[in-house]
Amino acid sequence: MNVFTTLQQFVPQQKISKVAGRLAASRHPWVKRTFIRSFAKAYDVSLDEYERQSLNAYESFNDFFTRELQDNARIIDASINGIVSPADGMISQLGQIHDHKLLQAKGRDYDIGQLLADSADGDYFADGSFATVYLAPSNYHRVHMPFDGTLIKTRYVPGTLFSVNNTTAANVPDLFARNERLVCLFDTAYGKAAVVMVGAMIVAGIETVATGKISRTDDIQEADHDMSFKKGDELGRFYLGSTAIVVLPKAAKTEWQATMQHGSTVQMGQLLANAKI
């Protein structure tokens, strides 16, 4: 590991994230105004595509960070078997899962069963495919459905809170299988599929339309669901968030778009792949 990632092992990750969460949720005029304006300036945030176009229109930093897009700001690919990006961001990695292994960064992989925190689910997706989308601070931070499906289970997995970026992906072993995350499992036209929302340093929380805001616990927490979604529907959001990983079964026979590769910039709803079913 380099110095940046080594230091993160020794800082109180949970305490830092807890404090960040309290500040981000504060509605105190000075606190919210200072955080929102400083963040918008630091990351050159434009509100042109958003429903509320004044920095003063937000009730807290969290409200600003999870700001909603204007209607029709994103076009959802309508192809029947198309699989779309769940978020605005950058393709960190994508491709096939080979014998349970997903690519994290060049020369570094990790186990699908560990990511999903379930060995049976890991076996099911052992030779499937995946796409990892990293959400930068300036991006739209809501996560949407990459396919039509019925949510059947959520699994909260406690973990570390390393920051997520190219440096940590290259240096922290099993980064996505170690960080706090929420696994969402769906029944789809091509079998079971998953969307994994991965937390990171100072991520103040993860919320979905099915679960509400997730409460941090020391143990894995599972819940059964029966909620149908259409491609492009909002699934959840990050409060100072991180990464979304789409996991597809072998039966989907995923064919990735030639333009989609490591480092590609994507928007929510943009076509990533087609399922050949």
UniProtKB/Swiss-Prot annotation:
<keyword id="KW-1208">Phospholipid metabolism</keyword>
<keyword id="KW-0210">Decarboxylase</keyword>
<comment type="function">
    <text>Catalyzes the formation of phosphatidylethanolamine (PtdEtn) from phosphatidylserine (PtdSer).</text>
</comment>
<dbReference type="InterPro" id="IPR003817">
    <property type="entry name" value="PS_Dcarbxylase"/>
</dbReference>
<dbReference type="InterPro" id="IPR033177">
    <property type="entry name" value="PSD-B"/>
</dbReference>
<feature type="site" description="Cleavage (non-hydrolytic); by autocatalysis">
    <location>
        <begin position="241"/>
        <end position="242"/>
    </location>
</feature>
<keyword id="KW-0444">Lipid biosynthesis</keyword>
<feature type="modified residue" description="Pyruvic acid (Ser); by autocatalysis">
    <location>
        <position position="242"/>
    </location>
</feature>
<dbReference type="GO" id="GO:0006646">
    <property type="term" value="P:phosphatidylethanolamine biosynthetic process"/>
</dbReference>
<keyword id="KW-0865">Zymogen</keyword>
<dbReference type="InterPro" id="IPR033178">
    <property type="entry name" value="PSD_type1_pro"/>
</dbReference>
<keyword id="KW-1003">Cell membrane</keyword>
<feature type="active site" description="Charge relay system; for autoendoproteolytic cleavage activity">
    <location>
        <position position="88"/>
    </location>
</feature>
<dbReference type="Pfam" id="PF02666">
    <property type="entry name" value="PS_Dcarbxylase"/>
</dbReference>
<protein>
    <recommendedName>
        <fullName>Phosphatidylserine decarboxylase proenzyme</fullName>
        <ecNumber>4.1.1.65</ecNumber>
    </recommendedName>
</protein>
<comment type="subunit">
    <text>Heterodimer of a large membrane-associated beta subunit and a small pyruvoyl-containing alpha subunit.</text>
</comment>
<keyword id="KW-0472">Membrane</keyword>
<dbReference type="GO" id="GO:0005886">
    <property type="term" value="C:plasma membrane"/>
</dbReference>
<comment type="similarity">
    <text>Belongs to the phosphatidylserine decarboxylase family. PSD-B subfamily. Prokaryotic type I sub-subfamily.</text>
</comment>
<feature type="active site" description="Charge relay system; for autoendoproteolytic cleavage activity">
    <location>
        <position position="144"/>
    </location>
</feature>
<keyword id="KW-0456">Lyase</keyword>
<feature type="active site" description="Schiff-base intermediate with substrate; via pyruvic acid; for decarboxylase activity">
    <location>
        <position position="242"/>
    </location>
</feature>
<keyword id="KW-0670">Pyruvate</keyword>
<keyword id="KW-0594">Phospholipid biosynthesis</keyword>
<feature type="active site" description="Charge relay system; for autoendoproteolytic cleavage activity">
    <location>
        <position position="242"/>
    </location>
</feature>
<keyword id="KW-0443">Lipid metabolism</keyword>
<comment type="pathway">
    <text>Phospholipid metabolism; phosphatidylethanolamine biosynthesis; phosphatidylethanolamine from CDP-diacylglycerol: step 2/2.</text>
</comment>
<dbReference type="GO" id="GO:0004609">
    <property type="term" value="F:phosphatidylserine decarboxylase activity"/>
</dbReference>
